[in-house]
Amino acid sequence: MIDINSSSSSSSSNNNNSNNNNNNNNNNNSNVFEINSSIKPYFTCIVFVISLIFICSSKNIVTKHLPIGRAGSSIIGATLMVYFGIIQPKEIGSVINWDTIILLMSMMMLSNYMEQANIWGMASKILLWKCKSTSIFMVRVCLISSIMSSILTNDTVCVTLTPIVISACKSTNLTFFPFLMAIATSANIGSSALPVGNPQNMIIATAGGLNFFNFFKVSIVSSILGVCLNTILLLLYFKKDLKNLNSNFNQLIETVNPKVEEIDNNHHDDDGANNQSKNEKEMENINKEVEEEQHNNDDDDDDGFNENKNNNNNGGHAILLVASSMDSIDLSDCSIINKDKKKKENFIEIYFNSKEKSIETIVNIIKLIFKFRVAIILTLVLIGFFIGMHMGFTVLFGVSILMICERKDITDIINSVDWELLLFFSGLFVLVEGFDRQFEKEAWTILEPFVPIDSTHLNVLKIFIFSILILVLCNILGNVPLVLSLSPRLLEALAPDFTWILLAFVSTVAGNLTLVGSVANLIVAEKSKSYHEIGFLEYLKFGVPSTILVILIGVPIVVLIGK
């Protein structure tokens, strides 16, 4: 006899074995290469440190022999983390912060549309328009750099504004270094005002779930004061250089200002000519109406004169008086009717004319909206931020509207996106996550005592030490890697909003400490190397006092407003 139970059990065991084999195969596929758990921390530390050396180094012996760039270093490090089982391949989708990637990509697209709308052309005119001294020129550079950085990210502003300022300095024989420092330092401080000002702010806002308006109301005050203080320090530090106002600078201003004024005058003349033509047309219409009324009155008088003449030729005075009175009444009624008809005709004509004018006005408004579509979309995007809409997709929605309005192939827009930067951040998310999984306890154990988490009982010493640690670590590890490392721990600790905003402010301003502290600094140095090569110590002499003073003033404001 055949034992059914044994056969069923054997079949079930076979199924279990096959399932286990499938699971093992799946695990082998997901874990590309599994290394020993005891080796993982050492391997992770080596990969992370070497990757950071390549990422943070601008030009040294290592990068000269292997110039793979930041994106290459990030991707190689992330690949090693995944290939050797530190992070599973199926986890990559959850490790990468897609909100930040989408926000970065969409802001780059919007920035390209703003460049097409000649926003930077207007900025260059503002820089030199009626500029009477180099000090005023310095202040304008600081203001434009900081304001534009809060909206378009500091990296984008440094890429675009640096050639404009270099061209102005070259034409006027001004020294380059003071104004290059103004671009870099003002861009970093100004970018701290909004969550879209720089990549680390975007990461903090998306990871911490911060409300745009709450971030803005806390950071805007410290950012404005920081920009003002930094501008004053620039004017004092470069006082001797700014005094060298030469004749070439005045000559340039004299040649630039008349062109701007000529454009304004032409614009006003065109408006005046249009207004004058409109007034002449209105006067002609009024004169025609007056002539028609006089002509009608003359016709009425002629009719009355003929009637009286006919009445005098008839006999019977009483009958003639009655008849003449009756005729005069009838004729007056007819004249009233004729006038009413003409009034109705004039009313209809005026109605249709006003209707045509209203249609013309609507068309002009539509044309005006289309002309300033980029500025309108930018304003609506900022409004969307303030009311709490998703930042990345809000910008992408605005960009989509501009794509429809342009009705052009978007190849140029796609090419304007810095895909290398997006790949760099994607790899960095994976790289930092791998390091964080192996050393989260050790790193957090060192930092946790100094992290201001309790918003009800503020410890001044703890806030001070936390700010100093962030300042130093940002210039060693980089602001973005540090923010990525701290974000998961702050989420677990349920850190209040002011802790996140404090991290955003200090990590952003910390970029002004050294030349390699911020990507924006490196961009300015790279763009200006043909005219002035910024030295590390040369930058450090101004960067250290400026950064420390801005943090000393800005941190208390962030804590007091944000708590």
Curated annotation (Swiss-Prot):
Residue stretches in coiled coil: 273-303
Listed transmembrane segments: 35-55, 67-87, 91-111, 176-196, 218-238, 376-396, 413-433, 463-483, 500-520, 542-562
Region (Disordered) residue spans: 1-26, 262-284
GO molecular function: arsenite transmembrane transporter activity; ATPase-coupled arsenite transmembrane transporter activity
Keyword Phosphoprotein in annotation: no
Membrane in keyword set: yes
Classification via CDD domains: YbiR_permease (cd01117)
Protein name: Putative transporter arsB
